[in-house]
Amino acid sequence: YKRLYFRTKPSMPFSATVGMQSAGFFGGTTTFYENGEVTRSYHLSRGAKMFLKMLIPTDGGVDYYAGSSLGSWDLALRYRLRNGATIRGYMQKPFENGSGIGFMNGFDALWGLEYKAPEPGWISGAVVEYIDLTNQSGPNHWDPDDFPGTTMGGESTGADDYYNNFEYNSFANYGMSLGTPFIPSPIYNTNGCLQFLNNRVRGFHIGIEGQAGTQWAYRALGGYRKGWGTPLMPLLEPESSTSVMIEGKYMPASVKGLEVCLQLAGDKGSMFGDHFGALFAVRYSGTLTFGKK
């Protein structure tokens, strides 16, 4: 993992942060299956030389890099109002290869606007986000170096296929996507596939939270997304989903550290189906004492 960021003086009313981050891994074993049977398997190179190729890719040939890498360009602009409230606009632009690093993937990014109040109130914070991952540097990927002897000498660096890789399982943690929940995670695949099957998505998210006095608090989240499959495996019909969550908390003044929480959430649409859930929780944060010494 490597990153490089620059930030202006954060104590000033206006502050900007810009930079990029990149994560990758190499080595391991790749196994291919067909109809549940292993068809072939091979070990990928590892060692100090491969580590350097993964860490610092170069140009030229078919072995100019090693492993699987992905990352993002990040930009955040924050302004502090005179009353102490802050407004922050931010962008995270993903990349899987050189085309994304060179901003050839169009408008693809997470775009957000966030508000934070100087102190708790009816509206303590709010956020609006828009995500678009439909460009992916174009619909095709072609590199003549991948097919020795071909007469097609042109090159097309599209079909970035975010989060997926030919030789490795997708970037997921126990089947859940990393970085954004807008891309349906592999754990939801009903066919057992470990890849992301719907990474060409577009959607938005809104959230708001606040408090009514010192004992009551609320949070409301809502979002909508629409997906068209992947660049290499598009869906015949797009899928969509609407998700909503409402949360209420009670924090009695008589018992410091005690919270009683109720959440109601639901999904509706063809992407995940129609679902409804509820959560009731009692939390205590503090020191438990039984009697006095």
Language model segments and positions:
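Signature for the C-terminal beta-barrel architecture of outer-membrane proteins
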Residues: 1-149, 204, 222-228, 237-239, ...
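Surface-exposed coil/turn segments at beta-strand junctions on protein surfaces, enriched
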Residues: 9, 80-82, 106, 199, ...
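Secondary-structure boundary/capping signal
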Residues: 14, 85, 216, 254-256, ...
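C-terminal structural cap/anchor segments
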Residues: 141-230
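C-terminal region/CTD detector
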Residues: 194, 270-273
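C-terminal structured domain segments
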Residues: 203-207, 213-270
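Outer-membrane beta-barrel "beta-signal"
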Residues: 274-293
